[in-house]
Structures are given as C-alpha cells and as structure tokens.
Amino acid sequence: MSQQTTIRKLAELVNTPVEKLLEQLAGAGMKFSGPDQVVTSTEKMKLLGFLRRTHGKSDVSVGAVREAPKKITLNRRRLQEVTVNAGRNKTTVNVEVRQKRTYVKTPESEYHTPTKPPIELGDAERVEILRKLEESRQRNLAEQQRLAEVDRQRVEEQERKRLEEEQAELERQKTESPVVEEVPVQSDSNSVKPVSKPISEDRTRALPRAVRPAPAARPSVSRSDDRNSNSGVRHKPRGSHVIVSDEDDSARRFAGQMHLTAAERARRGSNTRGKGGGSHRGATHRGNENSIRSSGAHGFERPTAAVVREVAVGDTITVADLAQKLALKSGDMVKALFKMGVMVTITQTIDHDTAVLVSEELGHKVTRASSSDFEDALLAHTEEVHGEPVPRPPVVTIMGHVDHGKTSLLDYIRRTKIAVGEAGGITQHIGAYHVETPRGVISFLDTPGHAAFTSMRARGAKITDIVVLVVAADDGVMPQTKEAVQHARAAGVPLIVAVSKIDKSTADPQRVKNELLTESVVAEEFGGDTQFVELSAKTGVGVDALLDAISIQAEVLELKAVIEGRATGTVIESSLDKGRGPVATVLVQQGRLKKGDYLVCGTHYGRVRALFDEVGHQPLAASPSIPVQVLGLSGVPDAGDDFVVVDDERLAKDVAQQREAKRRESRLVTSAGNRMEDILAQMGKGENQQVLNLLIKADVQGSLEALKQALVALSNDDIRINVIHVGVGGITESDANSAVTSKATVIGFNVRADASARKIIEANGVDLRYFSIIYDVIDQVKQVASGLLGVEIREEIIGVAEVRDVFRSSKFGAVAGCMIIEGVVKRSKPIRVLRDNTVVFEGELESLRRFKENVDEVRNSTECGIGVKAYNDVRVGDHIECFERIEVARTL
C-alpha cells in the first residue's frame, strides 16, 4: 500500500463513518477540508494518541509523561419519595440523595520504566494485522450463528411440547369456548450459513432473542479502538453472548402483543429500565430463557366504552366527596357546576337534586342513600310500643281572632285568671292545660290569635283532636278566624264554633253563622255537621254546653292510645330558664313518660330530671294526651319537634348528633343558595337599599319564631330587615359582642340583659330595646326602618297666574301682566311657564310688582306684573305656575 492514505480510505479500514473520523481528527487538532485529503502516518499516530488520552489510556506512543495522578469525580443524584407521618395522616415528601466519589489513578511511570518509542509499522504490516483481525471476527461470527441455531432449535422443541400439552388439556376439558392457539415463530430450517448480507430489520425483530444474528462487528486497529467506539455496549464477545440493542430488546419483550400501539410499546419498554436509565444487567447480554415470550401473550387493554358509575348520595354532599365517588377531578366537577349556573367551591355542600343533575350531565347515575343505622334503630324503638289501646282524653285547641275571648273562656273552665296577667291582654305563646271536668279529663291548648303567630296556630291544629273556634258575637268573622278554619281543615280535625260575648248588647250570633257560611262552615240548624255553641266567658252561660259538645265529639272519634311502653309525643313550646336550664313543654301521644327516661327531641337529647304540670306539681309519669314540662335536655328544642324515649344515652346522643350534622349541612346549602339569590337580586338594584340588622332574644321558641317572621316581612325594595341571630333566653355577653360587630339593634322580648352584656352595650352605644307585646315590637321596628329611609323631596304647587298681556321693559325685557287665579305667587319660589298645559320653561322670578311697587307675594284674584329671569318668550294665555319643594319623611 502506498504511504499516502485518504481520510475516506482510513474510515473504511477502521470501519468508522467519515463524518465521525473528521470530528475525531478535528478534536486532535488537525483540520481537514474533505474526506479525499491525505493522512500521513504521523497524523495517524497523533490521532491514536488523542483517542487513547480521551479514554484514559497512557499515551506511550506519543511519549507523554504523566506528572500528576489522574482524578475523576463522579456526582450522582437520585430522587426518591419518603412517607412521613404527620399526625393522623401521611405525607409523601420528595428527597434528593446526592453522592460524590473521587477516583485517583497513579501514573504508570511510577511503577514502570519508560518504554521505548513504538516501532513504526508500514502499511503492509498494518494491512496484515487488519486481515488477521477480520478472520478472527468471521470465526467468532460463525460460532455465534451456530450456537444461535442450537438455541433456536431448543426453543422450538420446547414450544412444540408446550403446545401439545395445551392441546391435550383442552381436549380433556372439552370446553366449547373458542381457543386462540399460539403459533410458534417460523424460521428457516436450513442451517445458518455465513452471512453475506445483513438480515432485514423486520425479520430480525420477529426472531427470538437467542436466534437473532449478532450485528456485524466493526473492524478495528486495536482493542483500545474497540473501547473508544461510541457503542453503548462494551464487553468481550464470548461464547453465545448476543449483542442486542435497546430497540431490539424492547421489541423482543413485546413481540407477541400485536394489539399494542407503538406508544404503548415505548412506554412499557421504558418501565423495565432502572432508575439510571440503563437496562438491567443480563437483559442484553444473556439469552435468558424466562425472558422469551410466546407470540400469544396478552396485555391489558384500555376500556373503549364510557364507564357509567352509580353512586348513592344522601340529602347533601360536598363537591369534593361527589367528585371522589364519581372518580373525577374536583376541578372538573366545579367546572360542570359552573356551566350549570351553580357557583361553588370544592368544600361547599350541594343538595341531592343538584348532585343528580350534575351527575347526569357527566354521564353517571345517582341514587338516594338509605337512612342511617341510628335512624333505623330509633324507628325500631318507636315501633316497639306494645299493649292494648285504651281510651284517652281528647286534645282540644282553642283558636280564633285576637281579643275574641279565647283565654277568658279557658280561664272560666279552669277557674283561673290567666288573661288578667298576660301582657297587653293577649296570648303570645301556646298554653297547655288539662282539666278534670264532670265529663272526664280534657286537655286544652290555647293558641295566640295575632297574625304573627300563624305557624304556632298551624302547629296546634296538627297535634289536636278537636278545634274550638271562638268568634266574638259583636265582631264577627275576622282574618285570623278564616285562617283558623283553614288550619283545621288542612289538619282534618272536626270543628266546634263557640260564639262568645253574647252578653253584650251589640251581640249578633246570627251574623256569625251567616259569615261562616262563606267559609263552608255550615251549622247543624242549617243542615251542616258543625256544632255552634253560644256562650259568655264572663257570666258562664253556655260553657257547660260547650263541654258537652266536646265530650260528644270525642266519643264519636273513639280516641285510643297505648298507655304502657316507651313514650312518644310532640314539643308544644320550649324556653330557657335561668335556674332550670332548657325547659320543653311536651304533649305525650303514646306510652308513658317517666322521670329518668332517656329521650331524643329533634337535635337535642337528655335524661328527664323532672316533670312539671301546669300548676307546678311534679307527677311521677305522664300518660297520653297529658301536657307536661320536661327538664334535663341538652338544649332548647324547636317547637313542633317529635320526641322519642330510647333505652340508653349513647343511642340518644348519636341520633341527636347525626341530626345536628344533617341540619348543619342543609343550612349550609340553604345559605349558599341565599347568597346566590342575594347576589342576583342586588345586581338589578342600586346601592340605595338600606339594611337594618336585628338581634332577637325571646323567652320561648314560639314567640321567637313569630317575631322573626313578622319582622322579616317588613322588608321591601328600599330597606331590608336582616336578622343576624335569634335565640331563646337572656341577652348574654356574646350577644352583645355580636351586636357591636354587626351594628345591630338588640330586641329583648320578655327577657333582659345580664350585667356583662349591659356593660358592653353601654360602652359601645348599642341600641337595646325591651318589649313584652308583639304589637310594640313591630311598630318600633317600623319607625327605626323609616328613619333609615331618609326624606323624600316633593313639589307642592302654591299658586297659578294667567298671562293677560305682555309689556316690554328695557331693564327686564318681556314683562307679563298676570292675574292670580289660584293660590299665591311668591318672589323667592321657583316657577314654570305652561303653554297649552305643557311645560315650556322652568326657572325663577326676576321681578314681582304691583302698582310699580316690588312685593314679596301676590294673592288670589290680584293683578301683578311678573318678570321671568332669562326668558322673553312669554305669550298671552300662558300660565305661570309657582311651586315649592318640601321634604317628607318616608315610611314603610
């Protein structure tokens, strides 16, 4: 070979791409413009020394001497997750582990004497060496192909035996299901001959790993050049070791899963690699038998159809919990609710209907969750009342218009004087009494007649057996009388009409009967089924006849109840006593209520510490239809709540707490809805609406409910009554602080503030008002609300002048000669000029004269001259209207 070798020829000799060889020459400090340039032997040795230095070999050929030991520092970083206990929960923390190692290599010159310079080899010797290396490579390749053929035959034999065993097993089972047989990989049965051309890529991937031919080895000048190559695999070809690239290895692992996409193949292939990104040891160096998968291997498939979930939801649920049940992201759930017009966050609560709508919008189904175990246990308790029903006393509710004599009638029956001691002479809460008469025991409920106590009257009609409608003979049918008839009809209870005050000279019982005909209440004498009794609570006339009518009606109804077992009933009224705590007036409807019983009453529970009747006695037990006061509850229950006696306090507490949680969730849903309604309502209104904040405390729950409803009803477009807090009992320090914060007016209905509350109220100037009559509360709140409305500017016409003639003045211009036809015209008041009853100008007077004298006012039927300021178009027949603006206080 000639001494001159081009770069292209050298690249073919060392089996390296021309571009890469040019890069290596450039890295060694030699610049070449093209692959056809000549490379000398010196430049070849310089390139060889550069490659050795690059890969850490001693450059003895160049004669370089290492003065200092070589150091190499390896920095390694690893990311891992550590689970940390944080209280009751666990938190995952990302931790970065950093490792640094330094390796020091001592120069070979310290252990060996300097070697002699290498002998320069000619091109002929170099070609001989390359030829021997090529022959060695061909021998190794032939050996590898022979071993690969042996491995292939062994694998095919194993596959054939396995298929025969599976076929025999399937025949034994005689199943009718279709069987997908695994087809072994077909390969050339001929012996592998020396490869003359590379195997196609598709065929290579289809072969098992042990059968694949190794890629052609590149010829190299020496072993060090083999190490200097950029291949990712650095090992000695020995025995049956097969070099498999990462791409071929990934294809081998999933060669049988034909349904996988290329992206899934890449993803699954990447999952088998180690943390450092390299493949596992031995996966690419040894033909492992276990790693060879059959062509029939099956993988996981992603569902093609939409997944429809069916979840159970109670009355309320938070947005985050609903998203978790539906396996959705909370953000997607909030977005879907926003599209439906519901603005919520992930922590807010939505009701069952909203959950159903949004779930159907997202393609899922929602069912109503079953009742809780506690409620089921409570229901089982109520159904365990056994015994023979026996007759019980009737429960009679006295209803009617205010001041028609309901309480006076009950006083006469009970031989008491309750009406005299009531504030304002009107009843403001339900009174429950039982009276022993010659005709048996009768329980009476006295309801208020004021319009504000509608819900209280409806509650009385719900738990009663008979309604006695009291109508004054001198007043006739009034609005609350009609309302009482509607309540009785809605509750489905019989009605007895008591026409009271017949001792008055203006009494007209016949008028009452005729007016009630319009309400479909027909007396017996008119062919109806309603009993009418005329009486006087003052003289006692007709009271016995009323008791007889009640007894007859009770016998017709055949009222019965079980008097033994656990008691159940209804709360009539409740209050907070300073010395006794929460006090509830209850009416027993089934069973027997005894001292020491555990009972659940709405969201409250407790043990009966004491029982009191209406006169203050402490009975040992209360039978059906007997009202009593109960002490020992955990809080003040709402009027109208049902109570149930249970076995132990644990069950009572669990049921009460669960009910409180449900009520709180419902309240949150309602408040969220109210906030939305407030926002939408305020969008259409200006900022002129005033707000009056109120804090109401009352003696009993029924009065509190009536007060809140009556005061909130006073709101209109100009002012809104906002009740920030209501409660039963005295005004406490926390109530005073709430009033200071919200700038609210405190209303105490039959209650007073304690010393600490009074101190805060006086220090901050809070408006505190005490009341005992509901009329006064409503009137005072109306006055306060009217004061917030401010004043209204109104225009009042005080005089009209008719223009009879027009004069010209050098000083004032056009002057109108007028006759006052109505009222009085004043100089200081504004005026309007009307032409054909249409306003053409509005301004003020510049001059008002009578007989050439300036005057302040001119009265009716008097002539005068009027000069209108900045207006000269006054005509005969116009009217000049004089008016004044006055301020008028606004009222509700």
Swiss-Prot record:
UniProtKB keywords: Cytoplasm, GTP-binding, Initiation factor, Nucleotide-binding, Protein biosynthesis
GO MF term list: GTP binding; GTPase activity; guanosine tetraphosphate binding; translation initiation factor activity
Biased composition, class Basic and acidic residues, residue ranges: 165-175
Record-linked PROSITE patterns: G_TR_2, IF2
Binding residues annotated for GTP, in chain numbering: 400-407, 446-450, 500-503
Pfam families listed in its UniProt record: EF-G_D2, GTP_EFTU, GTP_EFTU_D2, IF-2, IF2_assoc, IF2_N
One GO CC annotation: cytosol
UniProt function note: One of the essential components for the initiation of protein synthesis. Protects formylmethionyl-tRNA from spontaneous hydrolysis and promotes its binding to the 30S ribosomal subunits. Also involved in the hydrolysis of GTP during the formation of the 70S ribosomal complex.
Protein known as: Translation initiation factor IF-2
Native organism: Xylella fastidiosa (strain 9a5c)
Name of encoding gene: infB
